[in-house]
């Protein structure tokens, strides 16, 4: 088995799917099951572990915002925006953890209950419809400074639901922000930055509660394959972050929304067809 090639494929899948409204966990899960023959729990743990590449991409792309956050953390920033972003991330991350950890512990037990892969496709379809409707029915104009505590808690709850396989973290978080009236570019940006603490927490929880599965996943691909997948995911992610934010700044937001919604829906259908459940 060519682990280098598999690492490249998994890296591309992770790098693309993390930023558009298709669940990166689900896509990596399907590829891992198809190419590597991993068990559901091992493949799911591997999908979360692979987010190292997308975390690196977000840190690199938003390095100025991260620098501002660090200054705000030690009260050395003179920008109100840095403190607002820090408040946003702290609250969202806490709520995400309270929602996501119990859901993760539930998910890793699902194979015992016989969860069919078709459920993943159905959840993706629902996710795509929510994303489409949220953008169709609202004209968002808010920025970070307009968000109230209740709004931030809602975003945290939405991001926590992404612990479920089939739910797109970026999709559901961006949709929640736009439903709350946040401008598309700002919604994408906040969603992408909030990935960093959420994904770090997800990796920590995965290693803590699924050490055996993580070990199996790493050995199934080999260390070199894993490293290559992370590097590829990082570069692909940077490209997609830049492309989505640039597109969100244009007057073609409706086109972007329709494309993302269609991708989410088609992805769910193809996922089911690929596994023979439709």
From Swiss-Prot:
Recorded GO MF terms: undecaprenyl-diphosphatase activity
InterPro entries noted in UniProt: UppP
HAMAP family: Undec_diphosphatase
Taxonomy, superkingdom: Archaea
Its membrane topology: Multi-pass membrane protein
Protein's name in the database: Undecaprenyl-diphosphatase
Location in or out of the cell: Cell membrane
One GO CC annotation: plasma membrane
The gene coding this protein: uppP
One Pfam family of this chain: BacA
Species, as recorded: Saccharolobus islandicus (strain M.16.4 / Kamchatka #3) (Sulfolobus islandicus)
Family: Belongs to the UppP family.
EC number: 3.6.1.27
Purpose of the protein: Catalyzes the dephosphorylation of undecaprenyl diphosphate (UPP).
Catalytic activity entry: di-trans,octa-cis-undecaprenyl diphosphate + H2O = di-trans,octa-cis-undecaprenyl phosphate + phosphate + H(+)
């Amino acid at each position: 088995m060519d682990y280098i090639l598999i690492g490249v494929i998994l890296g591309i899948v992770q790098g693309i799917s993390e930023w558009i409204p298709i669940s990166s966990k689900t896509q990596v899960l399907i590829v891992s099951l198809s190419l590597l023959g991993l068990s559901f729990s091992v493949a799911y743990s591997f999908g979360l572990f692979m987010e190292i590449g997308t975390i690196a991409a977000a840190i690199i792309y938003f390095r100025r915002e991260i620098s501002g956050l660090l200054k705000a953390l030690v009260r050395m920033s003179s920008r109100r925006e840095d403190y607002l972003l820090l408040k946003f991330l702290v609250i969202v991350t806490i709520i995400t953890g309270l929602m996501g950890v119990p859901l993760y512990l539930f998910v890793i037990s699902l194979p015992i209950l016989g969860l069919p892969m078709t459920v993943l496709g159905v959840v993706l379809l629902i996710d795509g419809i929510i994303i489409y409707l949220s953008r169709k029915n609202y004209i968002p104009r808010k920025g970070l400074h307009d968000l109230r505590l209740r709004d931030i808690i809602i975003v945290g709850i939405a991001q926590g639901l992404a612990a479920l396989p089939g739910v797109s973290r970026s999709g559901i978080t961006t949709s929640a922000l736009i439903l709350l009236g946040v401008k598309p570019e700002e919604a994408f940006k906040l969603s992408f930055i909030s990935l960093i603490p959420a994904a770090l927490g997800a990796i920590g929880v995965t290693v803590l509660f699924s050490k055996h599965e993580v070990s199996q996943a790493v050995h199934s691909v080999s260390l070199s394959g894993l490293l290559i997948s992370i590097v590829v995911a990082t570069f692909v992610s940077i490209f997609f972050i830049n492309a989505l934010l640039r597109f969100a700044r244009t007057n073609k937001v409706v086109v972007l929304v329709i494309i993302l919604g269609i991708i989410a829906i088609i992805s769910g259908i193809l996922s089911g067809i690929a596994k023979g459940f439709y």
